[in-house]
Amino acid sequence: MHVMNCVSLVSDKENGNIATAPGFMIGQTPPPAPPPPPPPPPPSPPCSCSREECPSSPPPPPPPPLPGEPPIPPPPPGLPPTTHMNGYSHLGKKKRMRSFFWKTIPEEQVRGKTNIWTLAARQEHHYQIDTKTIEELFGQQEDTTKSSLPRRGRTLNSSFREAREEITILDAKRSMNIGIFLKQFKKSPRSIVEDIHQGKSEHYGSETLREFLKFLPESEEVKKLKAFSGDVSKLSLADSFLYGLIQVPNYSLRIEAMVLKKEFLPSCSSLYTDITVLRTAIKELMSCEELHSILHLVLQAGNIMNAGGYAGNAVGFKLSSLLKLADTKANKPGMNLLHFVAQEAQKKDTILLNFSEKLHHVQKTARLSLENTEAELHLLFVRTKSLKENIQRDGELCQQMEDFLQFAIEKLRELECWKQELQDEAYTLIDFFCEDKKTMKLDECFQIFRDFCTKFNKAVKDNHDREAQELRQLQRLKEQEQKQRSWATGELGAFGRSSSENDVELLTKKGAEGLLPFLHPRPISPSSPSYRPPNTRRSRLSLGPSADRELLTFLESSTGSPEEPNKFHSLPRSSPRQARPTIACLEPAEVRHQDSSFAHKPQASGGQEEAPNPPSAQAHQLAAAQPENHASAFPRARRQGVSVLRKRYSEPVSLGSAQSPPLSPLALGIKEHELVTGLAQFNLQGSQGMEETSQLTLSDFSPMELESVGHRGPQSLSASSSSLTPMGRDALGSLSPALEDGKAAPDEPGSAALGSVGSSDPENKDPRPLFCISDTTDCSLTLDCSEGTDSRPRGGDPEEGGEGDGSMSSGVGEMGDSQVSSNPTSSPPGEAPAPVSVDSEPSCKGGLPRDKPTKRKDVVAPKRGSLKEASPGASKPGSARRSQGAVAKSVRTLTASENESMRKVMPITKSSRGAGWRRPELSSRGPSQNPPSSTDTVWSRQNSVRRASTGAEEQRLPRGSSGSSSTRPGRDVPLQPRGSFKKPSAKPLRNLPRQKPEENKTCRAHSEGPESPKEEPKTPSVPSVPHELPRVPSFARNTVASSSRSMRTDLPPVAKAPGITRTVSQRQLRVKGDPEDAAPKDSSTLRRASSARAPKKRPESAEGPSANTEAPLKARGAGERASLRRKDSSRTTLGRILNPLRK
């Protein structure tokens, strides 16, 4: 095949066409690197190749062309050429080219046809490639390499041949290892041997020199090398080195001397360092006083722990015992005896804790060992001594090493001395710690102290961590205690705060200053008794609160400057739910401050921080203060023309027996000016008349009554202000009808309406004497029952706020709901209580938020009007009268057994609440105050709870005791839940027994006693609704209160309003306990809620609850009890009347 190819290639060459074609194709295909790659003319490349090769090898020109084409073969068109190209072209002399991997066209497709390749063949002469250039660029260097390789090969071959000529004496493997070792020195074997001979170790390390010792020839090898008599130059590298080494005398000793000389200084330096460290560590242990103190502490602790035992009373202990301290666990988790020792050391001196810092070298001894140091030193001695002895045989070597040996010996002696000193000190240390020299080693001693230092430091750190943790825990506990205290203070003092004697005393001492804490509303906690469930709260945006606010604004504008409420001691509250202000009847600043403080206290009890003060106590104090200031207070009120409805929950004190002793200066009796409409002229009897007047709290007055008081205020106030003593029962009797008309009777027991001193209502301008009833319980006290109830839920309502009430004629906002409208004492029977009082009353009775009470107040005014209107028709006596004229509120004087000091606002009439929500039932309650609304009942529970906490006396007759247990404690009692008072629709309210109804009785006795007896005669209710409606401001006319007022005429007939007022009345009913009961019945949509619930209960026990309430009151006086019962019945009637309104 190859021959054929060669022939074909030769023929192609001869043809020339092919040769030219390949040349052309090469020109045509510059990309192909190989010069003869043209596929169709593969022979042509051979031609060129052959041309080139012909001179070199003319006989085999064909084969060379093939080899010339192998670079082209990838593209050769014909297989034969390809194989031929793959032939021996490379083996030929021609330079090999890099292959160009292309795809060739079969030759048969190209030849004999007209195509680009045949054309190119024709024009090949025009395009010729520079073969030399392409060879230079793409020729492989293999040729050169091969040429050089053969030369190198020849050289190597010659060297190998020479090596082969070398003589190898040593083992091949050993010879190789030695050769590798020697190459690192980059010196000839002879120079290395010369350095060894001369003892020059500078250029060699100790390790290198030691390697020389390893490669020293063995005896057999020495014999062979010595036996070698041939050409030394022919020996291998290793053999040559060993051969030259054995020629050096004592070569082995010389190398050893070189190694010792090289290693001696480092070894000596290391020994010096180690010995120094050990000796220093020994000194540290013996001189560290802190360590010694720690050891003594350990000894003391051990003796204490082991006292009485065989190990007790020890004088010392083994050092190894130090490590056992951590193993003795303490009773305290995570603590052991070592921790205790560390604590004791800290107590003694904190410096003791840092003793380990003075044992710095002891820590370094961890890597050292006295034995190792001694062994190393001994080795140096041996080596030096051996060398010294051995070199004696070789004078030349001895001279070389003489200086070194002298230096080494000197150093070794010095080290030996150091070592000896170290040993002595070690023994001294062991003796110092009373250890056995034979058993205790220095290394062990150091190890014990190292471990002890480590453990002690860890114990110190643990103690610090523990102390820090304990401090953090204590801090957390303190914070928790503070939080708990703050909550407790909030719950006990701020939440559900009711008037208490303590607060009264505090305010007595501090005066106006003491009011500041009470003016700040406190958060209501669900756990606090004053907490009002959200479902019973009314949003400030609700219609009731907005109406109340409008009414408040209206009253303020009508009465005069908004500051007038302050004049009447209606203190502004910081929050919308502020405690209701006390009546302004108390002129003197002290009295006013007391009143305001009292009012705020009850207000606080309603929803603020103030500690619950027994309403009775406050009432007594207020009453006492009022008699002193009533005269001036009333005139001022009149002059101011401000219709300030004081706490509608405060009982009309004037209704109490006129003979009750004056209250203590702090007993802030709410002087309520009632415009008794349709009532006989008041018997203003000296102090009695004033007291009764004071007993008739402003809550007894309907807003219109207050307004009329404002108009009549100067006269009636002058008359009433003549004395704060409660009016004679006759006068009270005369008042009672008006109260019945205005629903005063219901209001009196539960809450004395704060009569607006200045009459904002022109209709009420009737010049009738206002009863400035100094309620034995402060207006705030009165609020305790009714307001307290409301205030608890409403704690921040502005209506309850002193100013809010004042501006609304605070009684209107709070007491006005029930008492103001119910007590139209000063207003003509025909006149309806001002809508203001009505609004205030609903706010109180409604149990809605104070904002809502404001709305209620607006609504209540109409209600009161309607109640009053109904009350004129209804006879006060009996529940029937109550139902008809439950609105009317009879003024009751204190019975002989009663006194103002005993007076407290006790919602007695609420007992009938369980009867059902019916204002008509209020008429049945006639003597009793307004039936507690469902809210009142709820609040009554809360208030009764607070009353219970405040004082038993504050607790009114237990509702459970009363037939319907609807009787409510005065403002103090409101917290007591009235179980019997339940609206059918409203959730049943538990009856809370009023532990001290007597105090409340006194309040009620004052308000109710006269009321019930005289309410009956005063049954003629003053249909003031028409008047009230005209009076109702435009904003109040559209309110529920206005509609309820309009409906109030129908109130007596409509006895069922349970569904309407349940939520609102539940709390407010409680709040309105005594004065509120009347008030809700009288007027207030809010009251309506309470009265609604109260009527329900009152029908069941309208008289019964009142009787139950009266029972405690009977303790104060049979008259009071009777009056309370009458009030309860009247309240029932009012509740019945109000129920329709609520609907």
Curated annotation (Swiss-Prot):
Q: One Pfam match, by short name?
A: FH2
In Gene Ontology terms, what is one molecular function of this protein? microtubule binding
Q: Pro residues: which segments have biased composition?
A: 29-46, 56-80
Question: What domain of life?
Answer: Eukaryota
Q: Name one GO biological process term.
A: cilium assembly
Record's subunit section: Interacts with CEP170.
Q: Which residues carry this modification: Phosphoserine?
A: S500, S650, S660, S664
Q: Where is the composition biased (Polar residues)?
A: 925-947, 1036-1046
Q: What is known of its domains?
A: The FH2 and MBD domains are essential for its function in regulating Golgi ribbon formation.
Q: Where is the composition biased (Low complexity)?
A: 521-534, 806-818, 958-968
Q: Does the keyword Phosphoprotein apply?
A: yes
For region Disordered, the annotated ranges are 16-89, 517-638, 706-1143
What role does this protein play?
Microtubule-associated formin which regulates both actin and microtubule dynamics. Induces microtubule acetylation and stabilization and actin stress fiber formation. Regulates Golgi ribbon formation. Required for normal cilia assembly. Early in cilia assembly, may assist in the maturation and positioning of the centrosome/basal body, and once cilia assembly has initiated, may also promote cilia elongation by inhibiting disassembly.
> What subcellular compartments does it reside in?
Cell projection, Cilium; Golgi apparatus
**Cross-referenced SUPFAM superfamilies, in alphabetical order?**
Formin homology 2 domain (FH2 domain)
Predominant cellular place of this UniProt entry's protein: other
GO CC annotations, alphabetized:
actin filament; cilium; cytoplasmic microtubule; Golgi apparatus; microtubule
Q: What is the effect of changing I180A?
A: Loss of actin-binding and ability to induce Golgi ribbon formation. Induces a significant increase in average cilia length
Q: Which UniProt keywords apply?
A: Actin-binding, Cell projection, Cilium biogenesis/degradation, Golgi apparatus, Microtubule, Phosphoprotein
MTBD as annotated region, ranges: 960-1086
Regions of biased composition (Basic and acidic residues) lie at: 848-861, 995-1018, 1071-1080, 1117-1130
Q: Where is the FH2 domain?
A: 87-482
Q: Which organism is it from?
A: Homo sapiens (Human)
**What PROSITE patterns does its record include?**
FH2
Q: Which residues cross the membrane?
A: none
Protein name (Swiss-Prot/TrEMBL)? FH2 domain-containing protein 1
